[in-house]
Amino acid sequence: MKETAKTTAKTRKAPKKPVGYQPRFSELDQYLFGQATHYDIFRKMGAHLDKKDGKVGAWFTVWAPHAAEVSVIGEFNGWDAHANVMRKVGEDGVYEVFIPGVTEGMMYKYYIRTPDGRELYKADPYAFASEKRPGTASKVAEIEGYRWGDSEWLTNRKKFDVQKSALSIYEVHPGSWMKHPWSESNPDGFYNYVQFAHSLADYVKKMGYTHVELMGIAEHPFDGSWGYQVTGYYAPTSRYGTPKEFKYLVDYLHKNKIGVILDWVPAHFPKDAHGLADFDGQPLYEYCLLYTSPS
């Protein structure tokens, strides 16, 4: 991802709302989001492929209440911060814009200018996919359309009594559990989600485990953290494949009567410039804690 977006410190006004303009982030969305009860917020925030006025493209929606200006930069507009300035929706600092011509797989970031003139280049907190590290851009991804085959598992899960049924959980980190020999095409040696699904299911059934607990699935920049430095909570890490391939992993395990638990990290995240820390120039996804010296 290019970190040299074409920008200027001069204030640019967001496009005026045309007569009859209906934001995708509706008044109900605004209310639920403001009440912290929007339990399907991932369906509205982030990048979503859609059609508007007969044009195919994508909606982009982000929360940045402390920003002076927000725009979408990406390979579809030459990473130009002038090209797609976002409109503010409501009073809670949510911004959105529809960009025609955007297709699945395109990389993007949010350009955020703070009131004091700082320019930030942030990955999308609600992205479904990310550029493979060391790249830090988000990627437009379509997550609908996968044909699940785990209906039998879901039906039986409703009858499962954790207090009375046998439970044996195998905790596993995909990137270190099993690797291919080194090759130029796969220097990391990682199994992709599909390969991992088959090898893991065979092992778990052989050993008699009922569930697996997957570590390091949410996107993170540093391999050595084992996934404990999250930058994208909604994006299965691109190290091992695509969101649809991750769905295959879950689906295949379920079809083999193996439950899936995700190990995730809500308590902390890294300070990487593209991540969640000081997202719009101030603490947004974290508390602002002021420490004083004991002396």
Regions found by a protein language model. Name each.
Residues 170, 212, 260-262:
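Hydrophobic faces of well-ordered beta-strands that scaffold small-molecule active sites
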Residues 179-180, 187-191, 203-245, 269, ...:
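Aromatic-lined carbohydrate-binding/catalytic grooves of carbohydrate-active enzymes
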